């Protein structure tokens, strides 16, 4: 992590470098929870050797402007990268997030799962690229994003790209974006909950998987408290 620099609000810069060596197993947890005057610049790079298994968990809850880039080079055969990410954008937050997954090794695997929620006048752009290089035969890459919009003014943009220099690879993109299902909300409310409580229950169900991966109960509590604060 790099220190904050003062100016028109704070700027927080973070650079993360991950090296999954041969046959290694690595877990990384990246948490961003800053106030509304903070601009966040994130750069994450992962390099995976043969049979390396790397899991990255990301939590983005706050910051007036977030610019985040994650790049991974799956260099080794049977290298395996999993990324699970959650974000909650609100007020006038601006999120610009990019993922680049480059497959080089044979039978390499990448799996990107993103769950987001947006409210007020927040804006988010997500760019994701799966690139199967020549020599990455029998590899598999998957990218999935699910976004819940809690207001008409919130805007979500997704730009997926799939590139392939091999024939026998599998690349999948999936994205869903929309408001909460009214029938589901009505059903939950019929159990005695308010609408706000019903909405919170649905949002929490999307976030609970990555949050439960944290071993530190203090960090878990801080993240859940931040989600509750954003819901209002």
What residues fall within each predicted segment?
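Beta-strand-rich extracellular passenger or scaffold domains
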Residues: 6, 26-30, 54-58, 83-84, ...
């Amino acid at each position: 992590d790099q220190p904050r620099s003062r100016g028109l609000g704070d700027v927080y810069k973070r650079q993360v470098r991950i090296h999954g060596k041969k046959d290694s197993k690595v877990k990384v947890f990246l948490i961003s929870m800053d106030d509304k005057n903070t601009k966040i610049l994130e750069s994450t790079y992962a390099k995976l050797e043969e049979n390396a298994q790397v899991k990255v968990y990301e939590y983005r809850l706050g910051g007036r402007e977030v610019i985040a880039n994650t790049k991974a080079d799956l260099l080794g055969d049977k290298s395996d990268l999993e990324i699970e990410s959650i974000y909650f954008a609100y007020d006038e937050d601006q999120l610009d997030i990019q993922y680049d997954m480059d497959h080089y090794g044979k039978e390499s695997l990448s799996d990107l799962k993103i769950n987001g929620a947006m409210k007020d006048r927040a804006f988010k752009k997500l760019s994701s690229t799966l690139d199967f290089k020549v020599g990455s035969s029998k590899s598999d890459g998957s990218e999935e994003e699910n976004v819940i919009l809690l207001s008409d003014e919130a805007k979500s943009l997704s730009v997926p790209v799939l590139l392939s220099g091999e024939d026998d690879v599998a690349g999948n993109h999936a994205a869903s974006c929309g408001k909460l299902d009214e029938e589901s909300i009505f059903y939950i409310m019929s159990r005695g909950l308010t609408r706000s409580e019903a909405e919170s229950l649905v949002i929490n169900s999307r976030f609970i998987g990555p949050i439960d991966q944290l071993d530190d109960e203090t960090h878990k509590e801080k993240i859940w408290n931040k989600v509750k604060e954003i819901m209002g």
